[in-house]
A protein has these predicted regions:
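Flexible, acidic/Gly-rich N-terminal and inter-domain linker regions that tether
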Residues: 14, 24-120, 425, 433, ...
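Canonical Radical SAM [4Fe-4S] cluster-binding loop centered on the CxxxCxxC motif
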Residues: 24, 115-144
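Core AdoMet radical
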Residues: 131-146, 153-179, 185-206, 213-264, ...
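Flexible glycine/acidic-rich beta-alpha junction loops that bind and position SAM and/or redox cofactors
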Residues: 173, 226-235, 260-286, 305-330, ...
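Catalytic cores of alpha/beta
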Residues: 205-214, 285-298
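Single conserved hydrophobic/aromatic residue that forms the stacking wall/gate
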Residues: 1-16
Length: 476
């Protein structure tokens, strides 16, 4: 039966009943009585399959709506947790597994089912597509529907984990309890051992957040708007207290779990991949300084792993409280990520990147180059003598390159070509370093000027093709 289509199975059962009716005319034919029970089983199977097909179509219709509603949440990288396969469980994550595509810390592209439990919401946040006053298709998954959908997608190798968020229905605790039930059923009923990222609902109770951390690899609460006065302007029903309280619960849970596991080897882990958050860029008047100072404060907490920056998308153009943007500020978003990288991996302090006299990042050049051009007195740096911290501040030198420089110069002095082989971007670095065997034409930032170096490193404008020029296409 499994090898044929539903239509073929229906025809098969119809023909079988015709045969059975003919045989039943003979009351002495006892074999027909046993066939009758076989046919009953076939009918039950077909009806069950028919109901299952209807349910699947219904679930897929909900999935189309709720996946579309979830696409504006960017905080779905699943880096930072390891779950190895165990007997009796299904699935695993390897080295931080982050149907959306995300990237793990080692650069691998991974797949997550990124979906909302419901896009109904009691709040009317101006920046949100799912706000209460918007007229859009709405849907809600039951807990069992979402759990079964996740397992079906996982078995078919569509996904490697789940990223689950939700609109707020009734109250934060009611919504959070349903999110927890999804994760709990996946772990305990289906023995799912893949990656799970849950959004913690602002205002949810400590007990529910603590329970969520026992089943999820990562928890996140979105700050959204850095300044509370602007948050109140766009989302009057929210405040920062309701956001930072769950963050505190998550932090306490992670630290307590870490302490318990030092004493008891098999103590349960709590959100082993820590927590993350998201900030909307461009919806309000905050400067890059406001955003980065908030990020720096959040990174000061031991369990905050990532702050994500989401360029504001004009989804509610009718609301006059919002800026009229033709497209998201993607360049600004990219510069914030680069500055965030400097805070996390390059040992920069936030007031070195932005301050009162320089509140916004330069959109034409990256933040590291911008800092170097504002501090020419720090350069040139002797590659063969500078310490690791100073090497990290040289434009064109990354974390990996700096480590290789420190390791390689123990054996011999490094020159221009050795640095190029190591991976240093000499197009940038040449203006900020001295080393062995420099080409004669190379000049440092002090010999030229910061303005001259900036003009040399700015990308050249693309030449426009004259519309009157004849273009010949010779094919391949």
């Amino acid at each position: 039966l499994h090898s044929t289509s539903r239509r073929q199975r229906q025809m098969c059962i119809r023909d079988s009943f015709l045969s059975f009716s003919f045989c039943n005319l003979c009351t002495e034919n006892r074999a027909c009585e046993s066939l009758f029970f076989v046919f009953l089983i076939l009918i039950v199977y077909l009806r069950k399959e028919s109901r299952s097909g209807m349910m699947n179509e219904n679930v897929l219709a909900k999935l189309k709506i709720l996946a579309e509603s979830a696409k504006y949440d960017v905080s779905c990288s699943s880096s930072g947790t390891v779950r190895s396969n165990k007997p009796g469980t299904l699935g695993n994550t390897v080295g931080g597994w982050g149907i959306c595509h995300s990237f793990a810390e080692d650069g691998r592209c991974i797949s997550l089912l990124k979906v909302m439990l419901t896009n109904y919401c009691i709040y009317d946040c101006a920046y949100c597509v799912n706000r209460r006053s918007n007229d859009l298709p709405r849907a809600t998954f039951s807990v069992s529907e979402l759990v079964e959908l996740t397992m079906e997608f996982y078995r078919r190798n569509y996904i490697e984990g789940l990223f689950l968020s939700s609109g707020v229905v009734r109250n934060p605790d009611y919504t959070m309890e349903r999110l927890v039930r999804v994760a709990k059923d996946l772990r305990q009923v289906y023995r799912f051992n893949g990656y799970i990222h849950l959004k913690s609902i602002p205002g949810a109770s400590r007990e529910l957040v603590n329970e969520a951390g026992l089943y999820a690899d990562r928890l996140s609460v979105n700050v959204e708007i850095p300044k509370e006065e602007n948050l109140k302007l766009l989302a009057p029903e929210k405040d920062h207290k309701s956001v930072f309280a769950p963050m505190k619960y998550i932090q306490q849970g992670v630290l307590e779990s870490k302490e318990e596991r030092q004493k008891f080897r098999h103590a349960p882990r709590f959100a082993p991949a820590g927590q993350s958050t998201q900030v909307i860029v461009g919806a309000t008047s905050e400067s890059d300084k406001d955003i980065l100072f908030l990020s720096s404060a959040l990174y000061g907490r031991p369990t905050m792993k990532r702050v994500y920056y989401s360029g504001y998308v004009s989804v509610n153009t009718y609301d006059k409280r919002l800026p009229a943007l033709k497209q998201p500020p993607l360049v600004r978003e990219n510069r914030l990520y680069q500055a965030d990288w400097l805070l996390r991996f390059y040992q920069f302090k936030v007031d070195e990147i932005v301050d009162d006299s320089y509140p916004d990042l330069d959109l034409e050049i990256d933040p590291k180059l911008s800092w170097a051009l504002r501090h020419p007195e720090q350069f040139p740096v002797d590659i063969n003598k500078a310490d690791y911290e100073m090497l990290l501040r040289v434009p064109g030198v990354g974390v990996k390159s700096a480590k290789l420089i420190v390791a390689s110069r123990r054996f011999s002095r490094l020159g221009f070509y050795e640095l190029k082989k190591i991976g240093v971007v000499m197009k940038k670095a040449q203006y900020f370093i001295t080393c062995k065997e420099l080409p004669l034409q190379m000049q440092t930032v002090n010999e030229l000027s910061p303005q001259r170096v900036r003009s040399l490193l700015l990308p050249k404008p693309k030449k426009k093709v004259d519309e009157r020029q004849l273009l010949l296409d010779f094919g391949e």
